[in-house]
Each structure stands twice: as C-alpha cells, then as structure tokens.
C-alpha cells in the first residue's frame, strides 16, 4: 500500500461510475410525467436540474420556463407540491424497476477505483437517488465489482442533499477523514460539483460520460473527434459555471488528476 496525501475520493453514481450518459433517471422522468399527468417533457428538460434529489429535481423541471408555460396551458396553474408528490410517487416504482439495468460500470471505473484503494485512499459515494433506489443499485453494481467504502443516498440525512455539503461531509466523517482538503469530489453534474466546493474539497467534473453530454456508450464509441468536441463543449458550458478544479472527459482520465492533486497537497496547496 502506497501512502497518498489524498485521504478519500467521493464519487457520484449515475454518469460517473455507472450508467454511461446517466440515462436511468432521465428516461424515467419523462415516463413519470407522462404516466402521472399525461404531460410531455423532453430529455433535455428532464436532464436540466440533474444532480438534485429526485423530488427537488421534479420541482426544478416544473419551474423551467418551457415546462411551466405548457403546464399552465394544460392545467391552468403552476405545478403544486401535491402534483410533485404524485409525479414522484409515479417515478419511484419505475426507477426501482429499471435502475439495475443501468448498473454497468463506465469504461475502466472498477480498475481506477481499485487502484485508488491500493494506494490507501478511501472510496466514498453519494447520489441524487433516494435510499430505496440505492438499495437496488448498490448490489447490482457490486456484481460488476464496485464496492465503495461508504454510500449516502439523497434522503439519508435530515439536513438534505445537494448542492449543500451534507452528503460529502457525511462520507468524510464515516471514512475517518481528518481534513476535508485531502478529499476529492467527482461528479458529472453541477449540483454535485457545488456540493464538493461547499464541503471544502477538490472537485472534478466529468464532461463526456454523464448527464450534460447525454451520449449513450454506443454513441461515445462511434463518435468522431468533431462529435466528441461538440459534446464536450456543451457539457463544459454547463459545468464550468460551478468552477470545478478539474474538467476531464471520463473517470478513465482521473488517475492523472489524482497525481496532480497529490503533488499540490504535498506542496501545501489546499482547494
């Protein structure tokens, strides 16, 4: 075991470690709006607030100007909390039924994680999924070899989820981290990057494997350089507003970032 100045890396789940393109939640949001109220949203609208807890995500979709306008046209008022509750109640069984189908690791994620563990770095994780979804996803991902040291779901803590620091800090506490400046938060969505900043950690945004690029793994594999460049810049525009310390394509590029942060920590730098 090598001694690293990095104590922990805290990963998001969908679009970061598993589920290339973060399709499990987005497609289900579209389905839940349709099933719950016969109301159509598109994938771009479903993706817009990704990273929040799912109830808050539905609320944020309802507040998008395009959705709010159509909701007013169809129902004569803005979306209410009761309507959000109904969509959420529709969403949950759909999500639980599908999430295990999206548990396959992204690229060489398992090797990257295991190499971090070999260096004595703890592996934390948190998600916008609630606990009842995570209870299905965790064992499904374990079958592929993903075994984080700790998992926090968005509804585990009474204080709430992203973009606040609570889930990241809960990981730090449970992993025995003595200094949050030795932690790295890795995420494909802005609220998760904000979470890392709010927790005083280094932050790494993922451009091509997650929600903002919205590519399937097959599209990613087949894409030429120009297509990837367009997808990369689309994601960069969204993620750079959260000013992550690093922006990389996928988890496959993370080892170089870890090495750089190790050098910076040893030189006395902090996030």
Swiss-Prot record:
Catalytic activity: phosphonoacetaldehyde + H2O = acetaldehyde + phosphate + H(+)
EC primary class: hydrolase
Entry keyword set: Hydrolase, Magnesium, Metal-binding, Schiff base
GO molecular function, one term: magnesium ion binding
Names of the cofactor(s): Mg(2+)
UniProt cofactor note: Binds 1 Mg(2+) ion per subunit.
EC number(s) given by UniProt: 3.11.1.1
Gene Ontology cellular component annotations, sorted alphabetically: cytosol
InterPro entries given in the database record: HAD-like_hydrolase_sf, HAD-like_sf, HAD-SF_hydro_IA, HAD_sf, PGP-like_dom2, Phosphonoacetald_hydro
GO annotation, biological process: DNA repair; organic phosphonate catabolic process
Positions of the catalytic residues: 12 (nucleophile), 54 (schiff-base intermediate with substrate)
Homology family: Belongs to the HAD-like hydrolase superfamily. PhnX family.
Subunit-structure text: Homodimer.
NCBIfam families hit by this protein: HAD-SF-IA-v3 (TIGR01509), phosphonatase (TIGR01422)
Name of the protein in question: Phosphonoacetaldehyde hydrolase
Lineage: Bacteria, Pseudomonadati, Pseudomonadota, Gammaproteobacteria, Vibrionales
Gene that encodes it: phnX
